[in-house]
Amino acid sequence: RVYDNIRKSIQFLLSSNLAEVLTILVATLLGFTILEPVHLLWINLITDCFPALALGMERGEPEIMRRRPRDPKDGIFAGGMGFDVAWQGLMVTAVTLLAYFSGLLLTCPVQMDWAALVHITDPLAHKTGMTMAFFTLSMAEIFHSFNMRSRRASLFSMGQNGYLWGAMVLSLVLSTVVLYVPALAAAFDFVPLSGTAYGASMALALAVIPVVELVKAVQRAVHR
């Protein structure tokens, strides 16, 4: 159980940090700013910290006593964990980038081509996109922590982890406060999101759950 929980926390943190690195890398290569250093600091201190600790409190999985003894030579990435970290990081990167461009499209009054979107000059549109990217990334990582309760079993077959629910509520409240309290929003260079933009960000973030559930189902079928 202890070793399992350590691996879950490591996989969560690595996939989350990979998503942040890839998001910044793609934005830099395309020539725009999607997140500022203070945003990443907030995500690493607030969004990632509490769920990682909560995963360490996870109960043992039901089939844990039916597993074969673990090979002492196996590394921390054994059993396909490295692959899972990679594709899950790419998944969170994709929803974050989609959130940014959704913010631009929701704000700009006219149709814009790809070049105009990448090199946006409207300050309000850029701030809206950046705010949506931040909120989507924050919540996607929170929801992804629920995926990490088991590497193969469905989230919906697991019992409750009150610590993880508490971490989610705390992160949701704090991340929302940053968007809507004027002094904090100004410090983070955010703009208040409309109901549509807030809902779109939440929907994009939630998408990580069905995607991971689908992949887990395929993995269970392959290894049956």
Predicted feature locations:
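C-terminal transmembrane module of polytopic membrane proteins
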Residues: 56, 135-224
